[in-house]
Amino acid sequence: NKNIENALKDFKEPMGVTIKMGGAQEEQEETSAFLGLALAISFLLILIILVIQFNSIGKPLIILSEILFSIIGVLLGITIFHMEMSVVMMGIGIVALAGIVVRNGILLVEFADLMMEQGMSAYEAILEAGRTRMTPVLLTATATMLGLVPLAVGLNLDFAALLSTGNPHIYFGGDNVAFWGPLSWTMIFGLSFATFLTLIVVPSMYLIRAKVKARLFDEKPVEIPED
């Protein structure tokens, strides 16, 4: 395809003749454009809901940064393990991740806000939020990833044979792994990377936001203990 595209660049088209790439490449380009639009729409809808929920633009942007983390995680996972991925299933996985990974950020930010309402400083609040919400965040992400592992590796189990003969005929691979594998690995890579960064980057961004807000509105500065 690349050779054809390079040849077409130097080819002078006759009057009234239009040349374009068709077939699988055309379908892939249309699918990629659709998935990009779907991701943008989901991003916008999540942003609107979060702005209404938190009555702020800074906190939703902190939470939505996890979508970027998940995409980076997907690309890193594919690169490190040298996997060949379906563009369609990888795109669907990223769109699905957009609605999953933000939950961890919501848990941290919402709990930190609750602690600040009770009189804690921004530093104490986000520290307590990280300490209190770390277990739920890790358990939820781990359970989700473990649930995707059978799809990712193509685990097959014959329940009918298990009930009748006691032999489940367990094997790995098959036709279904070509369909579900890319989707599952996309979500596993993205969720694991985003969850790890949630517990590090989100609290840092929350404190930076609190510092900037204190300077802009002449509020009490955010104090961070040296120890």
Feature names for model-found ranges:
Residues N1-V212:
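C-terminal transmembrane helical bundles of large multi-pass transporters
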Residues I208-I224:
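Membrane-proximal cytoplasmic C-terminal regulatory module of class A 7TM GPCRs
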